[in-house]
Amino acid sequence: MLGNILSAIDLPKGVVNILPVAAAVGEKVMSQAAKGIKDISLELGGKSAIIVCADADIEYACDLIIGGIFTNAGQICSATSRLIVHQDIADALFERLKTKTENLSIGDGFDTDTQMGPLVSEQQLNQVKKYFDIAMTEKLGCLTGGKVLGRAGYFVTPTIYHNVPVTSQLWTEEVFGPVLVSKTFAEDLDAIRLANDSKFALAATIVSADEDAALKMALQIQAGHIWINEQQIVLPQAGWGGFKQSGIGRELGSDGLSAYQKSKHVLLTH
């Protein structure tokens, strides 16, 4: 849609190019920029973690989990698609999360009662279906979902897999759909290790009643943007971007502005 709008105005070809968000695409863009030593910033994909600590309020944690992965049917670069939950509350949390997920209203995105809409295209539907098939091949435990809905449009069920091995493709690869994978942890260091065990490092969420402990954990997590007891809030005054294969450079804030500026120093002796 954006491409059609831009093509309808008097904009020279090549000024705006619309590309899929993927590390492989970023590599090609970087290689082209290298030929002319051009400045570049890249905001690519993610496989962000949401860590739920033992002292977290389960009801609120479930709301953050659902909002972090099922908003826009998971088609958000910063979607928190890896759930890392403390083993002491895991059973209670998964029970409540399953109920709330299965009660989500799925339908037309323009309907105010809809809580999760469709995928954007048949291509993306096939992408998500591919990961459903991989999950079956890998014999992953499916808490809920894992199906294409038999209705007009590109609808799938909101899906949760539990006790997913870190070697699984669903744990390591960006699905870009409403698919959540999960593991449990015993110690904070275990949660941090799991969160950082990714080629991506865009965002993360920490859910805890202890803000000091959450801040301490946040300092050890490799991610460009970390929410504590919140999810998917992006402030224009704060820089946005990630590490590793999630990209280079920053958008928004003073960091984003500096990407479009050049510093110059003039020294005069007299």
Q: What are these language model-derived features?
A:
Residues M1-V21:
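PLP-dependent aminotransferase-like
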Residues V15, V25-P165, I228:
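ALDH superfamily catalytic-core signature
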Residues P20-V21, A56, D88-I89, A186, ...:
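Short beta->alpha linker loops
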Residues L11, I51, S105, V148, ...:
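Conserved C-terminal structural/oligomerization subdomain of aldehyde/semialdehyde dehydrogenase
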Residues A23-V25, K35, D212-A213, L235:
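Short alpha-helical
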Residues M1, V29-S31, E95-R96, A218-L219, ...:
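Short amphipathic alpha-helical segments
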